[in-house]
């Protein structure tokens, strides 16, 4: 096993048994690839911006004498980088410029070109995606969530007997395009077939067929088989196809050639049919009555008068047959129908259809679509054509066409993106077949019928909407304007395009404020799949079926991770290995199985393809050659699990964690947890707040590293090399010679993020985890971010836990926590709050930011500088002034005394009021940063200039430092060059003293190479100078602020929050609770060695919840920590390195058939010591989902670490020193502090705002509300008979308006008298009753 530089420092012992066939894919691929597809040029014009442009352009004028043609587009560069956009509150975007051609023709008909004008036109800004799959919109980081919507195509469904009272099942079909009108086909209770367009009123399906230019005869011909009758004098001869008789009762003896095959009244069976077929009977004699009631298949005309005798679709009667016979017809064609599998639905539908020909059918459709408008033939034809046959209005899309053809069993997956008449006929035929009992309806929740619409596709659709708006305007301008003088630029208005794109990214339901609590919550948010949003479902209308786990979710969508509450099942998470295919369907990887041997070839299958195969599970036992050991293997086939012979198997799962999402795959022993609790565990990990000191989980699953690296919160080496410079804010790496590409430089600089506020007010801070002169390789972690430890995800802390009751303090999931945890700052978190103060231009004059504030004491101004802005580093608490600001006040009437004073002392500052920015109540912290934004043209104050000076100084220092490093890098490259070419020289420094450009070699070829080397450096120097110039310009220029805003001051407060009673904590198994008490260390239960536990949990919280994973984690944690303690003692006692190495190797070797053998032989002594030091706090262990440590292995590890195999130890009571009655389960569990802190929830109300109608106090902290004294609380007081307390609660403390004012007055005056009156809610009740027409009047009873 080859370890990266970071992994060598602390190797995680892996208990996985199965080999890892496929590496975990890049976890943000779904977002990044989709947006790449949107932005990158696609020469075929199938995707992205290119597709949008090609679908709208060329735009022709109404008269056809001019057209605007699209040539190509290019995206410019963003003015500001990501960080600058976040601080300035702007959107990270690039300008889109398009080359258009205006072609003017001489005359409309001949298309002779008169003039061509080409121009590059600006078409608005396109938001860009950052490297981590997010967008910066107006300074905030947002994520566009992928949508799971119904795939375009045709779907066959039934109402399952719910529509009609008889319980009859009514079948329907629906053609859903990507954009355009929906077409529904449906049966009613009488078995007539109808269509609906866009869910309007229904019409018989034959109206649509007639509008497509089919006559009655043609319609019958398409949908029915025929029966020919030959007319004789006394009877009829019927053409016989024996199969058609199956299941019928013979109405007469069926005889032929003197043989009676079937007697009258007998049911015709398969045996009878076989006899008829064997004797090759093709015609039988039938009585005359048999034809009466049959339906004619075509028109029959009188041969002389040419009048119709029988029209198509007419029921035959005796009279009609006589007329036909008289006219000399010898045969008649009828429709073959029966009640079993050839229903007469179309024939019946034709009878209720009032239209006669194409025109009347078109007019009927027009009336249905546009009720109330007088129809004309042209308008009707136009409307019908635009519904399904116009490229502008209808698009089935390539996905839709593929699904359509698959559903109708057409072999090709390509075809027109419009409908044609044969498509409509095929759908009608299939629906009739389903009604006849052939074929099944589709399963709408099957993932083959739902597809993913990702960011790129949604942005493209929005962009197209913007272009359509522009198209209308361009058409008008082409028709109205003077074409000789007009240019493409004059016709295109970029506003509608920008507005459409901006609206989507800013306010679409799927563009969401990124959940940035920790790296996991970021990754999960980007991999989320929502069924809600435009074109999707709504919460209210979604039933149980849509929300439920479907067999096709296997390996595509996680069955565990989904929110609790109204969105359950509608918002899902992508499975670890899932990806989308070219059509947008989810696919998952499988290993190919050939003749019972499992190969390492991997195929990705979508839900549509998967149904055909038999797939073995990942935990099936294989021998070393990949053969199945057992003859019968548990497999999945068509959504069901059963046993199959090993030779029948086609595929095998890739990994045991294939079915779960990233969040669920981080839960160790997930296989031992109940699904409901696992759901809570997966969801609560996303709410964990990054702790001050991160600590890796002792018991992990091996996914931690992938999450930490892919989330983008760590700094990862782009190229290998040596760490040349390092401080808290940047790392510089000298790249390996072989990794330097020609035009590039051999230096990589990584700027670290320091104390930045996240969307959830948590702190983002990166710290280096490499040392000077370390050798790193590409992909190594250089710096840890929030919630990561040595490149592994670390959301919480490993706590020593005991499962036992303790004086009632862990009743109902409460937790008892030791004071030691608080002292060691284990769960201390830093929260950064941003407070902003705006100075505006008002009608009375502009507001001013100043330290000269009226009626404020000197002490309040102590922390402000002369500009009125707080110092960095100041410790502030609730009510302190952060930014002094005064606002002009309206002129007030002055008293004579004031007038006199003003006349003597000049302008007094009484015409301004204090509107300073103060720290909100209940908040205290340290000021860590101040940002000042000044409008262009407004003079900057002293503090702003100071900040500007510091920023410029910092920028110069950075650039010059980088330049120096490049110079030294150049030196090395020159030295390397001279050595390589065997050129002798005295000393390099002497050589470099002169002008190095003047060095000339004898070999001309060397001269060229050397010159190129020097030029490369000079180009770089120039680039750097330019970079510095741009940076200084950005710093010094004014800011683009909202209208009327002169200045914005942002103050950042860092708030340190220790853990306290009321904070919510949780494990990873859904075991959540609230801290009930912080207990002194001396009172906590302790073991024989005097080591106290950190937390005490209630054992009753485990059995009923069935999350046994936490117990196994606790046991394994005890063993891992025990091994750490042994290593710690060995280091303390200065044991020989080879002994330490041997012990660590033995620890790694424990377990049964482990896939990942750890070889410490090639580790140097220095590396062993580093590893041992990192293992002191416990040996980290990975137990992958569904492939984790077994009970035997846990016992083995407990024994090895010197702990009892039961995992239970004797504890002593900290208060009395007595031994507890029985051994207690003690071990280490990974606990998380969730972002539900008591500080944010607690508040107190004195008096405040009231609801307008009921006059009752509002609720909630944001409204400064009160606690509702509800129905049950009233019952409690009634039960105690506390009548006066109850009266007080329901009157003066709530909505008795007069009573509460009097009460306030009385309290101020010092008397506590209460005069309850009429509660306002009673008056509301009276008014509601009056609104029903019942008058209630209150009378005073004397």
Curated annotation (Swiss-Prot):
The enzyme's E.C. designation: 2.7.7.6
Protein's UniProt keywords contain Nucleotidyltransferase: yes
Top-level EC class as recorded in UniProt: transferase
Catalytic activity annotation: RNA(n) + a ribonucleoside 5'-triphosphate = RNA(n+1) + diphosphate
The UniProt record lists the keyword Transmembrane helix: no
Family in the record: Belongs to the RNA polymerase beta chain family.
Function text: DNA-dependent RNA polymerase catalyzes the transcription of DNA into RNA using the four ribonucleoside triphosphates as substrates.
Subunit structure: The RNAP catalytic core consists of 2 alpha, 1 beta, 1 beta' and 1 omega subunit. When a sigma factor is associated with the core the holoenzyme is formed, which can initiate transcription.
Record protein name field: DNA-directed RNA polymerase subunit beta
Organism this protein belongs to: Wigglesworthia glossinidia brevipalpis
């Amino acid at each position: 096993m080859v370890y990266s530089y970071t992994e060598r420092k602390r190797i995680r012992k892996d208990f996985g048994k199965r080999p890892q066939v496929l590496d975990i894919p890049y976890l943000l691929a779904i977002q990044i690839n989709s947006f790449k597809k949107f932005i990158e040029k696609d020469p075929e014009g199938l995707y992205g911006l290119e597709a949008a442009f090609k679908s709208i352009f060329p735009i022709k004028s109404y008269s056809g004498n001019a057209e605007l043609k699209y040539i190509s587009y290019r995206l410019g560069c963003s003015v500001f980088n990501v960080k600058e956009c976040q601080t300035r509150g702007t959107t990270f975007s690039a300008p889109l410029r398009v080359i258009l051609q205006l072609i003017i023709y001489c005359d409309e008909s001949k298309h002779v070109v008169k003039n061509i004008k080409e121009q590059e036109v600006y078409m608005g800004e396109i938001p860009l995606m950052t490297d981590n799959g997010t967008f910066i919109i107006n300074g905030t980081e947002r994520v566009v969530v992928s949508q799971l919507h119904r795939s375009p195509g045709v779907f066959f469904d039934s109402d399952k007997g719910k529509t009609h009272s008889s319980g009859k099942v009514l079948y329907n079909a629906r053609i859903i395009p990507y954009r355009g009108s929906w077409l529904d086909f449906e049966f009613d209770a009488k078995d007539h077939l109808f269509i609906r367009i866009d869910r309007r009123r229904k019409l018989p399906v034959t109206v649509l067929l007639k509008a497509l230019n089919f006559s009655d005869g043609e319609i019958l011909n398409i949908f029915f088989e025929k029966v020919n009758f030959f007319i004789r004098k006394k009877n009829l001869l019927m053409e016989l196809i024996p199969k058609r008789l199956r299941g019928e009762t013979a109405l007469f003896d069926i005889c032929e050639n003197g043989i009676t095959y079937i007697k009258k009244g007998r049911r015709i069976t398969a045996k009878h049919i076989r006899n008829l077929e064997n004797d090759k009977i093709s015609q039988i004699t039938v009585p005359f009555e048999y034809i009466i009631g049959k339906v004619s298949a075509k028109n029959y005309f009188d041969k002389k008068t040419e009048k119709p005798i029988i029209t198509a679709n007419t029921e035959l009667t005796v009279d009609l047959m006589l007329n036909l016979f008289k006219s000399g017809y010898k045969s008649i064609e009828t429709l073959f129908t029966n009640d079993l599998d050839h229903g007469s639905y179309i024939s019946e539908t034709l009878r209720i259809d009032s239209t006669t020909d194409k025109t009347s059918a078109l007019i009927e459709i027009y009336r249905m679509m546009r009720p109330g408008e007088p129809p004309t033939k042209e308008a009707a034809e136009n409307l019908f054509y635009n519904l399904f046959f116009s490229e502008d209005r209808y698009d089935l899309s390539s996905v839709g066409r593929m699904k359509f053809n698959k559903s109708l069993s057409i072999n090709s997956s390509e075809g027109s993106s419009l409908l044609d008449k044969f498509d409509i006929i095929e759908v009608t035929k299939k629906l009739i077949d389903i009604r006849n009992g052939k074929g099944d309806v589709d399963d709408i929740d099957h993932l083959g019928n739902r597809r993913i619409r990702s960011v790129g596709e949604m942005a493209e659709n929005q962009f197209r909407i913007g272009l359509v708006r522009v198209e209308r305007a361009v058409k008008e301008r082409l028709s109205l304007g003077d074409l000789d003088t007009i240019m493409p630029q004059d016709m295109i208005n970029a506003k509608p395009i920008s507005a459409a794109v901006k609206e989507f990214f800013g306010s679409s339901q799927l563009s969401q404020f990124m959940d940035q609590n920790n790296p996991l919550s970021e990754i999960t948010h980007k991999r989320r799949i929502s069924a809600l949003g435009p074109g999707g479902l709504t919460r209210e209308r979604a039933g149980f079926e849509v929300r439920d786990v479907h067999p096709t979710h296997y390996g595509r969508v996680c069955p565990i991770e989904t929110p609790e509450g109204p969105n359950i099942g509608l918002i899902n998470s992508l499975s670890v290995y899932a990806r989308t295919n070219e059509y947008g369907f989810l696919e998952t990887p499988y290993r190919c199985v050939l003749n019972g041997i499992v190969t390492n070839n991997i195929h990705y299958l979508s839900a549509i393809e998967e149904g055909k195969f038999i797939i073995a599970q990942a935990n099936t036992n294989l021998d070393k050659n990949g053969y199945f050991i057992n003859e019968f293997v548990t497999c999945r086939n068509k959504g069901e699990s059963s046993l199959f012979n090993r030779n029948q198997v086609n595929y095998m799962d890739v990994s045991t964690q294939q079915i779960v999402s990233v969040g669920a795959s981080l839960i160790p022993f997930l296989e031992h947890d109940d699904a409901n609790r696992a759901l809570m565990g997966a969801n609560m990990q996303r709410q964990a707040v990054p702790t001050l000191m991160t600590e890796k989980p002792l018991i992990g699953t091996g996914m931690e590293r992938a999450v930490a690296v892919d989330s983008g919160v760590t700094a990862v080496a782009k190229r290998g090399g040596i760490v040349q410079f390092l401080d808290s804010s940047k790392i510089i790496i000298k790249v390996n010679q072989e990794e330097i590409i020609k035009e590039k430089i051999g230096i990589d600089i990584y700027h670290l993020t320091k104390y930045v506020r996240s969307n959830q007010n948590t702190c983002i801070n990166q710290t280096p985890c490499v040392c000077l002169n370390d050798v790193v390789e590409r992909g190594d972690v250089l710096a840890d971010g929030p919630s990561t430890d040595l490149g592994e995800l670390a959301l919480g802390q490993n706590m020593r836990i005991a499962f036992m009751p303790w004086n009632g303090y862990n009743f109902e999931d409460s937790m008892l926590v030791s004071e030691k945890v608080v002292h060691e700052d284990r769960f201390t978190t830093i929260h950064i709050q941003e407070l902003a103060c705006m100075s505006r231009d008002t009608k009375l004059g502009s507001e001013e930011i100043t330290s000269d504030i009226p009626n404020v004491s000197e002490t309040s101004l102590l922390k402000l500088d002369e500009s009125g802005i707080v110092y960095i580093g100041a410790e502030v608490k609730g009510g302190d002034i952060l930014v002094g600001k005064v606002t002009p006040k309206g002129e007030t009437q002055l008293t004579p005394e004031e007038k006199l004073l003003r006349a003597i002392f000049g302008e007094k500052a009484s015409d301004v009021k204090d509107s300073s920015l103060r720290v909100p109540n209940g908040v205290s912290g340290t000021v860590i940063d101040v940002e000042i934004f000044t409008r262009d043209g407004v003079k900057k104050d002293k503090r702003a200039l100071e900040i500007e000076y510091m920023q410029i100084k910092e920028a110069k220092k950075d650039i010059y430092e980088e330049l120096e490093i490049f110079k030294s890098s150049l030196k090395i490259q020159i030295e390397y060059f001279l050595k390589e070419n065997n050129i002798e020289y005295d000393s390099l420094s002497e050589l470099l003293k002169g002008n190095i450009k003047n060095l000339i070699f004898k070999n001309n070829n060397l001269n060229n190479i050397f010159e190129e080397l020097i030029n490369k450096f000079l180009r770089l120097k120039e680039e750097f100078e330019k970079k510095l110039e741009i940076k200084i310009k950005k710093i010094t220029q004014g800011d683009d602020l909202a209208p009327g805003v002169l200045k914005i001051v942002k103050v950042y407060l860092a708030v340190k929050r220790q853990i306290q009673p009321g904070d919510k904590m949780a494990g990873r198994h859904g075991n959540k609770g609230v801290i009930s008490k912080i207990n002194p260390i001396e009172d906590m239960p302790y073991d024989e060695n005097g080591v106290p536990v950190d937390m005490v949990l209630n054992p009753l919280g485990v059995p009923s919840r069935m999350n046994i994973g936490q117990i196994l984690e606790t046991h394994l944690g005890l063993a891992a920590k025990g091994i750490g303690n042994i290593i710690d003692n060995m280091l303390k006692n200065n044991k020989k390195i080879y002994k330490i190495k041997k012990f660590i190797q033995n620890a790694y070797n424990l377990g049964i058939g482990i896939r990942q053998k750890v070889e410490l032989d090639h580790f140097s002594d220095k590396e062993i010591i580093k590893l041992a030091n990192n293992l002191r706090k416990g040996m980290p262990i990975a137990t992958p989902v569904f492939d984790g440590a077994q009970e035997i292995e846990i016992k083995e590890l407990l024994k090895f670490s010197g702990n009892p195999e039961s995992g239970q130890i004797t504890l002593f009571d900290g208060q009395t020193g007595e031994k507890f009655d029985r051994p207690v389960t003690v071990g280490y569990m990974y606990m998380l502090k969730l972002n539900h802190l008591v500080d944010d929830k607690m508040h107190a109300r004195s008096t405040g705002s009231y609801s307008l109608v009921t006059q009752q106090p509002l609720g909630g902290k944001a409204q400064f509300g009160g606690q509702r004294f509800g129905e049950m609380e009233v019952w409690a007081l009634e039960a105690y008979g506390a009548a006066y307390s109850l009266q007080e609660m329901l009157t003066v403390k709530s909505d008795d308006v007069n009573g509460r004012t009097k009460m306030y007055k009385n309290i101020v005056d010092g008397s506590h008298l209460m005069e309850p009156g009429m509660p306002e809610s009673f008056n509301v009740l009276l008014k509601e009753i009056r609104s029903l027409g019942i008058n209630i009047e209150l009378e005073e009873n004397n």
